[in-house]
Amino acid sequence: MAGPQPLALQLEQLLNPRPSEADPEADPEEATAARVIDRFDEGEDGEGDFLVVGSIRKLASASLLDTDKRYCGKTTSRKAWNEDHWEQTLPGSSDEEISDEEGSGDEDSEGLGLEEYDEDDLGAAEEQECGDHRESKKSRSHSAKTPGFSVQSISDFEKFTKGMDDLGSSEEEEDEESGMEEGDDAEDSQGESEEDRAGDRNSEDDGVVMTFSSVKVSEEVEKGRAVKNQIALWDQLLEGRIKLQKALLTTNQLPQPDVFPLFKDKGGPEFSSALKNSHKALKALLRSLVGLQEELLFQYPDTRYLVDGTKPNAGSEEISSEDDELVEEKKQQRRRVPAKRKLEMEDYPSFMAKRFADFTVYRNRTLQKWHDKTKLASGKLGKGFGAFERSILTQIDHILMDKERLLRRTQTKRSVYRVLGKPEPAAQPVPESLPGEPEILPQAPANAHLKDLDEEIFDDDDFYHQLLRELIERKTSSLDPNDQVAMGRQWLAIQKLRSKIHKKVDRKASKGRKLRFHVLSKLLSFMAPIDHTTMNDDARTELYRSLFGQLHPPDEGHGD
């Protein structure tokens, strides 16, 4: 069912003598009829932002014509209508449409003979219209001056129409209504502003969360890169240590002080020149290592005092990034590196001892700091591990107390090599075993390798093998267990390491008491294996003859 009809159309239908035709498809029930309600727009287009009108208020605005008499049409004259039209004309306003409808209604009423009113009635109507027009202008000016209030913001029409059923309402009621409208508008604007603030807070919280997460991710990535670089640096140092192991074994074989003059006398000038060149090379290497140590100590702020001679700052254990940048800038401006001293060979022991004593302060502080961090991360250990509850520095001091035992471990000969100028140890004779009697083997003394001490050597094979074992375990721990090739390589590396540590010596294979044989490899692409054995054809023939009791060739037997 359509909405309320304008006044002109109602008058036209009343004056039309023809009967109206009923639409059979029209819905007689008003409650179930479909309604199309236009947007209620009473203000000018140039004013503030529009407010969203809810469905309940739209229904309330549609029924205003039925409940309030002010929204119904009223009689007026053409002169008054023209004055009102020209004074209130604004582009795009809804008043033009209303005035056009009223004008069309007046023209229709004039054409239908509605000029039967008396002049007195028309004058009274004109005066009343002029008074209403002045009041409307005053109300518009008041609404324009009042900040934060506009006609378009009026949305609560039920409160606006309370107590206004009569046309002759007083100004006090109008003031109260305007106050109620302003209060409603303030509540609506306050509610919207709170929603906007909540949205802004949510957006700010999201921004903070995103920023925090990005910062956290970047920090974790930076830590991962630092750990990766540390592992790569440790691998390079370990590789250098592995290469130095061969040089260490060769150094242990050099002539010792008691026989060195004899080698020097018998070596002649060639031996003396080689000795002089090696002495210069070792001196240059020692200076390079000391220079590298000074460079590394100077680059790190916590160890710079060891090089430039300043006092250590024990309070500052960690330096922030900003302080580190300032230190780098100052270092670029002026780098105070101590003058390099050319030390003699006899000065290096005292210099290195003093450097180590100064470095001990920083070493102990760093060890204690990281020990505390790992202890907090791993939690408190059980009562059974009381030794680990002590400080890391206490444990180190306890181990270093027995220096003689530690020195004996470095002076113990663990590898098989011969020191030049020393006689070879006499081999113990192996007693022959008579037939029918059990074989007698020489009894080796218990822990014989620990009794082979030499004060002129330095042997740390136990520590070296421990480093190799840890390296192999770390390299192979990240392998896929399903990768058979990688597992095979790991097994070969472990077996090679074990063969270096413990050599398998078969004592029963001496003096020809055990047959030695070589297993030939399988055929590959119909190619016979290459014979790497040292036996010639005559030895093989003699071997096969001895197996079957034929010690002499067959032709010799027939000749006899």
From Swiss-Prot:
Gene Ontology annotations of biological process type: cell adhesion; embryonic cleavage; negative regulation of amyloid precursor protein biosynthetic process; negative regulation of apoptotic signaling pathway; regulation of mitotic cell cycle; ribosomal small subunit biogenesis
Post-translational events: Hyperphosphorylated during the G1/S phase transition.
InterPro entries: AATF, AATF/Bfr2, AATF_C
Residues recorded with modification N-acetylalanine: 2
Keywords, alphabetical: Acetylation, Nucleus, Phosphoprotein
Subcellular location: Nucleus, Nucleolus
Phosphoserine found at: 61, 63, 150, 155, 203, 273, 316, 320-321
Region (RB1 binding): 316-372
Ranges where the record places region Disordered: 76-208, 309-333
Principal location: nucleus
Record's function text: Part of the small subunit (SSU) processome, first precursor of the small eukaryotic ribosomal subunit. During the assembly of the SSU processome in the nucleolus, many ribosome biogenesis factors, an RNA chaperone and ribosomal proteins associate with the nascent pre-rRNA and work in concert to generate RNA folding, modifications, rearrangements and cleavage as well as targeted degradation of pre-ribosomal RNA by the RNA exosome. May function as a general inhibitor of the histone deacetylase HDAC1.
Protein name per Swiss-Prot or TrEMBL: Protein AATF
